[in-house]
Each structure stands twice: as C-alpha cells, then as structure tokens.
Amino acid sequence: PGEGIDIMRFDVDTTVADDVLLYDQLPPGAEIWSRLTTEDATNERSFVMSWSHAPGVFLINGKQYSEDRVDETVEKGATEIWEITNTSPVPHPFHAHAIQWQVLDRNGAEPTGVERGWKDTVLVNPGENVRIIGRFEPVNFGKYVYHCHILEHEDAGMMGLFEVLP
C-alpha cells in the first residue's frame, strides 16, 4: 500500500479495415438536437431533495421510496418541466430512467457549455434549484424510477417511482 502503481501497456500493431463512414462535418440539414423551451411543456412538476433528522434517511418530496407507490403519472408523448430543489447540505446527481433532459436553468441562469446538451443526470448542489425539460417519447411507457445517483442516498430512500401511461 502506498508504494508505486501498476500500469498496463497496450501495444497495437495491426490495422483492421473499417467501412464506417465518418463525416468531417455534418451534411446540410442534419440536426443533432434542438432546444426544448417552456412553450413546449405540457406539464410541470416539483421535486425537493432533502434529508431527515434521522441518520441515513434521504427523501424526495418528504417521502422515502416505496415500490408499492407510484409517485408521478406521466402521459406518453408529454413534454414536462421538472424543477428540482436541493435543501440538503450535500450535492445530489438527479437521474431518471427512460428519458433524456435538457437543463432550462440553474438558479434562474440559462445553461452554458456542456449543460446545454441532452442529459440523463443533472447535478443539483446544496441550495440550488434546477429546472429540466424532457419529452416522454411514445416508446417509453411503463414504470421507471428517478433518484439520486449516489448509491448510498438512493438506498437510503432518495428515489421515486413514475409511470408513463400508454
């Protein structure tokens, strides 16, 4: 322990034929992504990530996860804004299954740089309020979870269940 590290060396000595076409630039009219706006939204929801005074208890909207309870019901094809507020003293990476998001704003400020792209997880720091927008595509019906992506927080209850109706 504490003495040196092992490093693996890779020697690549063969080239393999590859018929994959990679563009130097995208063809005219190709759209990588488009920004969703508040005008696209058909519904808004609020989520508060917090912790309890009881040791090791993490909550979303004042509740611990229960597989027997659907916390949110979403219409298939809906575009929704989810507002996530972190009232705890530690950061929480908010993650939802089966949907990609765009950050609308963080504490009221528009996203810049890498925050402008599609996300499946968004970091919400202590005291922050982050609004995200996503479209629940037609293939995404069924029950899914949203949760803090820190395993110990998720296991301690910081998770909810949402259902996308067919």
Language-model segments: residues:
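Beta-strand signatures of extracellular beta-sandwich domains
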Residues: 93-95
